Amino acid sequence: MILNTKTLKVLLIGGTGTISMPICEKLAIDPSIDLYVLNRGHKALPTGATQIICDFNDTEQLQDVLKHYSFDIVCNFIIYKPQQAIQQIELFRGKIQQYIFISTVATYNHETAICIDETQEQNNIYSQYGQDKTKCEQLFFKAYQQFGFPITIVRPSQTYGYDRIPLSVKGKSCWSVVERILNDQPVIVHGDGKSTWHCTHTFDSLITLSN
């Protein structure tokens, strides 16, 4: 993807999570990028990023805040439900050059294959999270087909980095597992502990998205 402009105005929605923070840090020091980050303002941003404080799920507030800005690229890390995808399509239709939706490998059906690529069937009956992300993808594809909405979809695997270690069963955070290790207690694993599982370091996601 090559965009013919000297300085790109980039908006990250989210921007302070496991996947998004390293991307935010890299773009913030890139002289060719004018970086904006929209979130609720609970975490500090790196120098060079302009923060827009807003609740992404409050559509009226979001519309009111963003009417003062224009962007070339929007990357959203926090779409989980179809209605959020619809909101974003309606909000940015005809206004941007590229929209990047961070989806997940949990959309894929893993029953028929261990090693998968983009051709794998998307029908994960075991993950509501994956099913919802699939519905979001379908809405973005439909928008692309109907009126050329400039969508790019990225499907990371489970990601570890700053404050997360590569664990397959951990709950919302890693500390409970670390505490069990420190206390010489058994650690829960998926299956019999020998099954294949893939994870991605946050800097690998950074390379993919920043390019």
Question: What are these model-derived regions, one by one?
Answer:
Residues L8-D30:
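N-terminal Rossmann NAD(P)H-binding glycine-rich loop of SDR-like oxidoreductase domains
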Residues T152-S173:
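Flexible, glycine-rich beta-alpha linker
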Residues T104-Q128, K142-Q146, R164, V169:
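Active-site "gating" loop of Rossmann-like NAD(P)-dependent oxidoreductase/epimerase domains
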Residues Y126-I153, L182:
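Active-site Tyr-X1-5-Lys
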Residues G48-D58, I78-Y80:
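Rossmann-fold cofactor-recognition segment
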Residues Y69-C115, Q131-K142:
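NAD(P)-cofactor binding segment of oxidoreductase domains
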Residues V178-I188, K194-N211:
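Alpha-helical substrate-binding/gating segment
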Residues L38-H42, F56:
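N-terminal Rossmann-fold cofactor-binding loop
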